[in-house]
Amino acid sequence: MKIFFISLGCDKNLVDSEVMLGLIRDRGFELTNDESEADIIVVNTCCFIHDAKEESINTILEMAEYKKSGSLKGLIVTGCLAQRYKEDILAEIPEVDALLGTTSYDAITEVIDKVLGGERTESFKDVDYLSEVKTNRVNTTGGYYSFLKIAEGCDKHCTYCIIPKIRGDYRSVPMERLVEEAKFLSEGGVKELILIAQETTVYGVDLYGKKMLPELLRKLCAIDGIEWIRIQYCYPEEINDELIDVLKSETKICHYLDIPIQHASDDILKRMGRRTNNEELVTLITKLRKEIPDIALRTSLITGFPGETEEDHEILKEFVRKMRFERLGVFTYSKEEDTPAAKMKDQITKKVKVARQKELMEIQQGIAFERAESMVGRKLKVMIEGKLVEDGIFIGRTYMDAPNIDGYIFVHTKDELMSGEFVEVTVTEAKEYDLIGTAE
């Protein structure tokens, strides 16, 4: 019995996919990379924004075609789209044989058995349920880095975001389970752990009554084989001195923080339901750069939010110029049904959203190149990710670069390097968002 699996959306969704793959493999099913020969296809979906929703629907319909042309006996849809649009999917896509909600992935093998038995079925647990399933995750990222999801859900309820309704309230994974999972990943060859959640900085508050991310980091740093630990999805108002101290004192933790701020205008931040303001953001970023001079800061912004005036946009542009983020992504606002922002007046046209996005990225482009040029001559520790077609050129990442979202360094060397290997590289040239260097 062959199973083909597609994982869409964010890295948090990917972790769910890897857990399901582990359960499927442990059950004795064969995993295949060829959808045309699959008996069962599982699509783990995303619907965070409109484009993600469309991609998920199109993928489901594309896979459904194999019921006509292939050996497909069952099509299973899991994840956020299944959670949010259960009734619509069942009514409008008859080719779908089963649905699993965002908290039901531990039931995947049971659902597969039912589908193979000819049953159309579904599995939905309480949205605040936290699975305790233990499995040997299938690492799909190449084996040398992996995401560690430390919590599920979110309590922030930003006005543009549907996640709390789909994923439930914030639930921290018990620390002992995370340490056990990290050890398992390390034993499998993982050298870089990337901590993720809808928000990482309040980890532990629900379980232990206080923020426990610093303590978790210390325990993870003690695991043999792990060389890099990277933290993503930090809410700015939750970053405290203890977290900064751990970043400074633990050498395995990359001097890199992903801090999605979304905007810099106080009016827009308030409309978004964000719990910070321009002055606090400037104070935090200034402090981080003072305490950790080589820190690389990544952020993401939303442009074209309802009610965003030209003045708000100019405030954001000036903020980007002054803060000079090492890494930055800009997204146009996506109007999501059942969110407060979708009901707001003064919705911005797509043309204006895209124009403002372009202006911000042009500013960041110049900053990124200047920052890249400043790295020329420096020696950096680089994780090798693979080899390019050209002989002697490898691609890797520095501590400043998270996989899939940041830049790369192209490494020239006479040696034969392996994926996951760490080498010292001298930067010789700067590109727009990438670096070029040599390894002796």
Curated annotation (Swiss-Prot):
Enzyme Commission no: 2.8.4.4
Molecular function GO terms recorded: 4 iron, 4 sulfur cluster binding; aspartic acid methylthiotransferase activity; metal ion binding; protein methylthiotransferase activity
Cofactor: [4Fe-4S] cluster
Cross-referenced InterPro entries: Elp3/MiaA/NifB-like_rSAM, Methylthiotransferase, Methylthiotransferase_CS, Methylthiotransferase_N, Methylthiotransferase_N_sf, NA-bd_OB-fold, Ribosomal_uS12_MeSTrfase_RimO, rSAM
Localization annotation: Cytoplasm
Transmembrane annotation, as ranges: none
Keywords: 4Fe-4S, Cytoplasm, Iron, Iron-sulfur, Metal-binding, S-adenosyl-L-methionine, Transferase
Top-level taxon of origin: Bacteria
Function of the molecule: Catalyzes the methylthiolation of an aspartic acid residue of ribosomal protein uS12.
Stored NCBIfam families: 30S ribosomal protein S12 methylthiotransferase RimO, MiaB/RimO family radical SAM methylthiotransferase
Protein name: Ribosomal protein uS12 methylthiotransferase RimO
Biological source species: Lachnoclostridium phytofermentans (strain ATCC 700394 / DSM 18823 / ISDg)
